[in-house]
A protein has these predicted regions:
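Residue-level signal for well-ordered alpha-helical positions
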Residues: 32, 58-59, 113
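Structural detector of well-ordered beta-strand residues that form the stable sheet scaffold
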Residues: 19, 42-44, 64-67, 102
Length: 116
């Protein structure tokens, strides 16, 4: 992700935001921005990891937000569906679990010491 972000920044120096597929990529994008001396571009990601929440708490961090998934809720939903299958019950072919946006304004509500 670091090399990809460096390439993007080289080809698109006026980019204003980077959206990453996960929090680890966001950290790499932030590193690439720092190496390029770019302190204006913001970074968004998906996961809601404890590390990215710590970054969100920093006033000067370019990490602007993450869409938080809940491994706990995902696991509970998976077990519920597995039990339905084992019991021969009907189940949805596709299912979803709610996610939520974390940003600098609401990260304190969720804490930075774990997953939701």
């Amino acid at each position: 992700a670091l090399e990809a972000a460096k390439k993007i920044l080289n080809e698109q120096p006026d980019i204003t935001a980077i959206m990453c597929g996960n929090d680890q990529m966001a950290v790499a994008a932030k590193t690439a921005l720092n190496l390029a001396g770019n302190d204006q571009t913001v970074v968004y990601s998906i996961d809601g990891s404890p590390d990215i929440k710590k970054e969100l708490k920093k006033a000067d961090s370019q990490i602007a937000g993450t869409v938080a998934q809940s491994p706990v809720n995902i696991g509970k939903k998976a077990v519920d569906i597995a039990l339905d299958i084992l019991e021969g019950k009907d189940f949805e072919k596709e299912t979803s679990v709610d996610v939520f946006m974390l940003n600098k304004e609401n990260v304190e509500m969720y804490g930075a010491d774990g997953w939701q």
